[in-house]
Amino acid sequence: MGSSQSVEIPGGGTEGYHVLRVQENSPGHRAGLEPFFDFIVSISGSRLNKDNDTLKDLLKANVEKPVKMLIYSSKTLELREASVTPSNLWGGQGLLGVSIRFCSFDGANENVWHVLEVESNSPAALAGLRPHSDYIIGADTVMNESEDLFSLIETHEAKPLKLYVYNTDTDNCREVIITPNSAWGGEGSLGCGIGYGYLHRIPTRPFEEGKKISLPGQMTGTPITPLKDGFTQVQLSSVSPPSLSPPGTAGVEQSLSGLSISSAPPAVSNVLSTGVPTVPLLPPQVNQSLASVPPMNPAATLPSLMPLSAGLPNLPNLPSLSNFNLPAPHIMPGVGLPELGKPGLPPLPSLPPRNVPGIAPLPMPSDFLPSFPLVPEGSSAASAGEPLSSLPAMGPPSDPVMTTAKADTSSLTVDVMSPASKVPTTVEDRVSDCTPAMEKPVSAVTDANASGAS
């Protein structure tokens, strides 16, 4: 792969000591050596390009003393410098606590064999090979081609074979002793699938400047992050799926996106929830006249729905008024008679019975809705010469007509009262004070009543 051309090694060459295994809490572990990817190429300024005892002698000469090492990483294709202190007191084997072998780091990441499926009870299963996470990186002999491993297996039929295996889950290398056996009862001599080539290389993590190397001892009890290769560069979790909706629905989606689900309901729903009727109400002028009307009796009904007896006021002090008959010719069509007594006035005392020929009994109006015609009750309607219910629909009253009706009633009271009674005079004075401008209609009605009485 030409890794030696990517970085210039002091002293030249592409050889070094390949780090296969790093023991936890060892001097090599504390120095940050990474298994499989690191190659020790120099120590204390001495280039290690030959397989001899130079490394051992340098380590023994610097026991319990820090020395500098130059390390080449096949992962990052860079050189780095590390300080290590050889020691016999750290509690493990060796001065550094690492397993190494002398080899070339040129193409170290390419000459690997990926362990695929492992058959049960096969030589590979008995040796402890793990499917898909194990990579055979070498043996005691040099292997630079894909056929080198298979040739080595054939020459070790029924004989123990030592292999160096790197595991991506543990991020460490180990020695595996396997005995090839073509008669194990399955296919092949190992009973496992072997992959070689670009698609079966060890996945590497991108190098980050200043990144601290994590070792197996530091990964205890923590989940292992999957490594990435050339086919896992895309992070599927961060990719937004493309829109699958037809192009024609884009405008509809944009218009619907502006709708607010939490918007306030229309004002109509608020009106309906409060119980306000939605039918047309009375004209504004009628509403103004009704603003001062006292509260309605709950038993009363609308004027168009008969009867209204439940809403009529109780006037027990006027029993004799039913004997009076108003002259029919003087009732004005289309005009309703308002009430005689307003709220706050004292009740009228009882008047002596008097029968005036040609005058119908005076009906009693209601205390509310003075703009609608009133309907007489049972016996009063039977005795009346001309029932008011047969009259045409009446419009809203005007003040002059209401004053005329009140003046007519007061004048009639004056004609029939006895000279000794003074209470009706009080009623006449109150009515006349309220309507001083209507003197002429009052006198006309009084003359007509006097002529009729005579």
Curated annotation (Swiss-Prot):
Annotated Gene3D superfamilies: 2.30.42.10
Tissue-specificity statement: Detected in lung, brain, heart, liver and testis.
Modified residues (Phosphothreonine): T222, T225, T435
Changes after translation: Myristoylated. Myristoylation is essential for the Golgi targeting. Palmitoylated.
Modified residues (Dimethylated arginine): R30, R47
UniProt-annotated stretches for the region Disordered: 377-454
Family annotation (InterPro entries): GRASP55_65 (IPR007583), GRASP_PDZ (IPR024958), PDZ_sf (IPR036034)
Chain positions found as Phosphoserine: S214, S411, S443, S451
Compartmental location: Golgi apparatus membrane; Endoplasmic reticulum membrane; Golgi apparatus
Main location: Golgi
Region (Important for membrane binding): 194-199
GO cellular component, one term: endoplasmic reticulum membrane
Region (GRASP) residue spans: 15-215
Lipidation residue positions, type N-myristoyl glycine: G2
One GO BP: establishment of protein localization to plasma membrane
Keywords of the record: Differentiation, Endoplasmic reticulum, Golgi apparatus, Lipoprotein, Membrane, Methylation, Myristate, Palmitate, Phosphoprotein, Repeat, Spermatogenesis
Occurrences of domain PDZ GRASP-type (ranges): 15-105, 111-199
Record's bilayer topology term: Lipid-anchor
Subunit structure: Homodimer. Homooligomer. ER stress induces phosphorylation-dependent monomerization. Interacts with BLZF1/Golgin 45. Identified in a complex with RAB2 and GORASP2. Interacts with JAM2 and JAM3. Interacts with members of the p24 cargo receptors. Interacts with CNIH1 and the cytoplasmic domain of transmembrane TGFA, prior its transit in the trans-Golgi. Interacts with KCTD5. Interacts with TMED2 and TMED3. Interacts with SEC16A in response to ER stress. Interacts (via PDZ GRASP-type 1 domain) with core-glycosylated CFTR in response to ER stress.
Protein's job: Key structural protein of the Golgi apparatus. The membrane cisternae of the Golgi apparatus adhere to each other to form stacks, which are aligned side by side to form the Golgi ribbon. Acting in concert with GORASP1/GRASP65, is required for the formation and maintenance of the Golgi ribbon, and may be dispensable for the formation of stacks. However, other studies suggest that GORASP2 plays a role in the assembly and membrane stacking of the Golgi cisternae, and in the process by which Golgi stacks reform after breakdown during mitosis and meiosis.
Similarity-based family: Belongs to the GORASP family.
Protein name: Golgi reassembly-stacking protein 2
